[in-house]
């Protein structure tokens, strides 16, 4: 009986080892069972039977003791994803359903299955099982006893689930995915959108709202369904719930309990295997799919831009019109002021010329007297008097121009008021027409030029110049009168050029040029001639050099007298006839004349502009 139970015990131990190592990934040779010794292959009767029993018991204890050690060293250096995939593949393998009568299972099938499984897992050696005769009844009681000693499968499942959870929690990619998920949720929750409402023109034209409010306000768009991860669609049937629980509802097997316990792990594995989709911005996913939102935004932006351009063009046109009106009014006033000043300046210039002629005659008389007196003092006095006279003349001319300018302004204001009062009186134009018929040709020309059409154009011009119509009419009439006066006036004589004034600074007295120096041949030699007071009749000096070497001391009697030394005459340059002061004054006078001519030319151009542009504008 013992000889018959021995192979069943060995087979049960082998099955326990296979179940313990079924979840181990390939490539760990340390997890494989050690090769059986020769004691298992060749059983011997008698004492050999007892020895084989002890050996089998020792193997079972060693397998039990090695299970926690192998469990600790089993998953070291293995990728969490690969480990989870291997575990799920091991779980998804369909197991053979247990027969209703467990006692009818044939030991030959178990032996063949164990041989096949062991050969595939080890990949290095096979475990030959000794051929045994099929017993009439399977060793059920022994299996139950050994099964009671085997570890509880529920504890193994709990340990495996906790291990997978730890692997998933401590994987480096899970923390990153959690951060990305939190950032995406925060971005979606706090995102706001700006929309332009084209119907309301008030401050509610542009409103800001959260994404949910915008989605509610846009009725033509339907929310898109959340995209399913396509990476894991092929693996769903493999990792789905195991069919054992549905097929065998009444029976309970370790495989069924294992599938039920690892169902949440398979769902977690789906989340691990599928890459996390990138957080897409809601406006690109919703507004990019439809054209209504884009069209609304484009229309709103186009209207805002068009309104801005129109306002800018209106502002520029108003500024340009105001600038032109200011320029025209400034030109008119400048023309009026410069025209009166010019005419009065011409009259004052005639008086100034007369006064200048009197001053010139007086100056000529004074010069004649100074020439009679002679001397250099008269030149300085003449310069000082000329400078004083010029300064007085300039001051008088300035005062006269200022007085004439103020008088002209007062007369212009009084004339404008008189013309306004006459225009307000009825029948004013009829009286002017009668006076024009009785008057000469000048009045007729005046009426012909100032016709009603011209007055209408002038009134239109006044609106552009921001001035009253009466003021513009009076200004234009004054301009016309001055123009006629200038045409009828005789040509003004060209004034003679001014003489260059005498220099104002005092010149130094003229010194007569020195006499030319005598020739060297005519000069007497110092050794030959002596002054008459020191020269003796028989005294002759030896031709010895005066200073043969430095620090040489000679007697004083031997030294020649100082009168006999050579005299060197320094030739003084003759006084130059070039007087820079007179040339500078002449140049200054010429520049003043050119400036006056340019000023007159500018006034003429201004008058022509007013006559041909402003007065003839429709």
Curated annotation (Swiss-Prot):
One GO molecular-function entry: hormone activity
Matching InterPro entries: VGF (IPR026128)
Region (Disordered): 23-46, 86-201, 219-262, 342-603
Modified residues (Phosphoserine): 421
Keyword annotations of the record: Amidation, Cleavage on pair of basic residues, Coiled coil, Cytoplasmic vesicle, Growth factor, Phosphoprotein, Pyrrolidone carboxylic acid, Secreted, Signal
Compositional bias annotation for Acidic residues: 379-395, 435-451
Residues making up the signal peptide according to the UniProt record: 1-23
Composition-biased stretches (Low complexity): 180-195
Coiled coil: 301-332
Basic and acidic residues: compositionally biased ranges: 356-378, 416-434, 578-602
Gene Ontology terms describing biological process: carbohydrate homeostasis; regulation of synaptic plasticity
Record's GO cellular component terms: extracellular space; transport vesicle
Residue list for modification Phosphothreonine: 425
Reported modifications of this chain: Multiple peptides are derived from VGF, with activities in synaptic plasticity, antidepression, penile erection, autonomic activation, and increases in energy expenditure.
Pro residues biased stretches: 26-37, 490-500
PTM sites of type Pyrrolidone carboxylic acid: 310
Protein name: Neurosecretory protein VGF
Organism field: Bos taurus
């Amino acid at each position: 009986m013992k000889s018959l139970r021995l192979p069943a015990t060995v087979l049960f131990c082998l099955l326990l080892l296979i179940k313990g190592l079924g979840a181990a990934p390939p490539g760990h040779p340390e997890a494989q069972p050690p090769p059986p010794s020769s004691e298992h292959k060749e059983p011997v009767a008698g004492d050999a039977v007892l020895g084989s029993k002890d050996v089998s018991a020792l193997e079972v204890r060693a397998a039990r003791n090695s299970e926690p050690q192998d469990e600790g060293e089993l998953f070291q250096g293995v990728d969490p994803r690969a480990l989870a995939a291997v575990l799920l593949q091991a779980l998804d393998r369909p197991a053979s359903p247990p027969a209703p009568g467990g006692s009818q299972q044939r030991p030959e099938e178990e032996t063949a299955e164990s041989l096949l499984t062991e050969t595939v897992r080890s990949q290095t050696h096979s475990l030959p099982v000794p051929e045994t005769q099929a017993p009439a009844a399977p060793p059920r009681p022994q299996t139950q006893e050994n099964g009671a000693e085997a570890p509880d499968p529920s504890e193994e499942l709990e340990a495996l689930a906790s291990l997978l959870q730890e692997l998933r929690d401590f994987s480096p990619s899970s923390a990153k995915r959690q951060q990305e998920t939190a950032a995406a949720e925060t971005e979606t929750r706090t995102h706001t959108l700006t929309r332009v409402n084209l119907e309301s023109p008030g401050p509610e034209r542009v409103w800001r709202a959260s994404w949910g409010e915008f989605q509610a306000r846009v009725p033509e768009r339907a929310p898109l369904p959340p995209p399913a991860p396509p990476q894991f669609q092929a693996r769903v049937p493999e990792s789905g719930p195991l069919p054992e629980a549905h097929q065998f509802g009444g029976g309970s097997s370790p495989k069924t309990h294992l599938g039920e316990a690892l169902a949440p792990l398979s769902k977690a594995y789906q989340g691990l295997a599928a890459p996390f989709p990138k957080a897409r911005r809601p406006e690109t996913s919703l507004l990019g799919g439809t054209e209504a939102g884009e069209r609304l935004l484009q229309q709103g932006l186009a209207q805002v831009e068009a309104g801005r351009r129109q306002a800018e063009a209106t502002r520029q046109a108003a500024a340009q019109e105001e600038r032109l009106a200011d320029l025209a009014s400034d030109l008119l006033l400048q023309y009026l002021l410069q025209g009166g000043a010019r005419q009065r300046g011409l009259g004052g210039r005639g008086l100034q010329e007369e006064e200048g002629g009197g001053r010139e005659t007086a100056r000529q008389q004074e010069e004649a007297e100074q020439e009679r007196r002679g001397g250099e003092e008269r030149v300085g006095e003449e310069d000082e008097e000329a400078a004083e006279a010029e300064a007085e003349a300039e001051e008088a001319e300035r005062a006269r121009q200022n007085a004439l300018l103020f008088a002209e302004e007062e007369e212009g204001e009084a004339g404008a008021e008189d013309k306004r009062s006459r225009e307000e009186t009825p029948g004013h134009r009829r009286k002017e027409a009668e006076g024009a018929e009785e008057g000469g040709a000048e009045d007729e020309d005046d009426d012909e030029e100032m016709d009603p059409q011209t007055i209408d154009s002038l009134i239109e011009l006044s609106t552009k110049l921001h001035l009253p119509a009466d003021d513009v009419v009076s200004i234009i009439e004054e301009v016309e009168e001055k123009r006629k006066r200038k045409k009828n006036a005789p040509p003004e004589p060209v004034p003679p050029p001014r003489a260059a004034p005498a220099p104002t600074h005092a010149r130094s007295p003229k010194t007569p040029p020195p006499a030319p120096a005598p020739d060297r041949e005519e000069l007497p030699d110092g050794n030959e001639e002596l002054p008459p007071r020191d020269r003796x009749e028989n005294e002759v000096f030896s031709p010895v050099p005066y200073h043969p070497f430095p620090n040489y001391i000679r007697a004083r009697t031997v030294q020649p007298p100082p009168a006999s030394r050579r005299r060197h005459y320094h030739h003084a340059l003759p006084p130059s006839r070039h007087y820079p002061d007179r040339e500078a004054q002449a140049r200054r006078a010429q520049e003043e004349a050119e400036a006056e001519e340019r000023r007159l030319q500018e006034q003429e151009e201004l008058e022509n502009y007013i006559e041909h542009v402003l007065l003839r504008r429709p």
